[in-house]
From Swiss-Prot:
Residues 41-123 are extracellular. Its main location: nucleus. It is found in: Nucleus membrane; Mitochondrion membrane; Cytoplasm. This is Taurine up-regulated 1 protein. It is a single-pass type I membrane protein. Keywords: Cytoplasm, Membrane, Mitochondrion, Nucleus, Signal, Transmembrane, Transmembrane helix. The gene is Tug1. One of its GO terms (cellular component) is nuclear membrane. Disulfide bonds: none annotated.
């Protein structure tokens, strides 16, 4: 089955806040829109049975969107397709360099070599890891 074409405008030549706004809005529609299903909405209770704060949920959502936007702008990952999924690039083995296995897409930038590692890509990987760790820390019950 052929893969759908990438969403237009996710990776562009613009820089700064314009890219962050465009990427953040598309990521919001991809990952958090209620039409995507129950998994896109915050659960009513945390796994430990305690009520999860909406403030924490919003902080996690903003952190995730910022981490993805930073990584996409640096050329580490790219969002393709629809349905709120980040898919492996064609020709990449599942889990290669730990990127596809982490739910992110390894891809080849038109102007440079293949970027398939989260660490060592002009600092973008480190911040992406920090963002994911922060999300995990905030989602864990006390």
């Amino acid at each position: 089955m052929a893969r759908p074409p990438p969403l237009p405008g996710l990776v562009g030549r613009r820089s700064g806040r314009a890219v962050d706004r465009a990427i953040g809005w598309r990521l919001f529609l991809l990952l958090w829109h209620p039409a995507l299903g129950a998994q896109a909405r915050p659960p009513r209770r945390a796994p430990g049975g305690r009520w999860r704060s909406r403030r924490v949920f919003l902080l996690v959502r903003r952190t995730r969107a910022a981490a993805y936007a930073f990584a996409i702008r640096r050329g580490v990952v790219r969002v393709v397709g629809g349905g709120g999924q980040l898919r492996p690039a064609p020709g990449e083995a599942a889990g290669e360099a730990g990127v596809a296995g982490a739910g992110l897409e390894a891809w080849r930038h038109p102007s440079g070599p293949a970027r398939t590692q989260l660490e060592g890509q002009e600092g973008a990987g480190g911040w992406l890891v920090v963002g994911f760790l922060l999300c995990l820390f905030l989602l864990m019950p006390p």
